[in-house]
Amino acid sequence: MSGTLRALTGVNALVYFGAATYHSGVLVAAGLLAPASIAEALLGLVLVAALVRLVSPRIAYGIVLAGTLFGLSIVVARGLLGVDLWIHVVMLAGLAAAFALLFARRTA
């Protein structure tokens, strides 16, 4: 994993842990959504596993993308178009940047 991808993976993990904290209700009671908190924490741990080389970055980012898209589908289906939508937009932006780095490494 390149230094840039490693740094981005760390930032992405922090985004997922931040979202998990928000959905745990610790910061804002209105954000309480336990299933989302658990899923986001697990996805953050998958990214940490990639950082410490327990899993390949490609596999980790594939898992995290699938989980994020699943979460986004729930957000849209429930009409939660405020903070929850923006959290997923930020997550997807981070994932897009990571995939760009992963594919750039592969073709270079």
Features from the language model and the residues they span:
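Membrane-water interface at the C-terminal end of transmembrane alpha helices
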Residues: 2-11, 51-59, 94-108
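A loop-to-helix transmembrane entry motif
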Residues: 23-42, 89
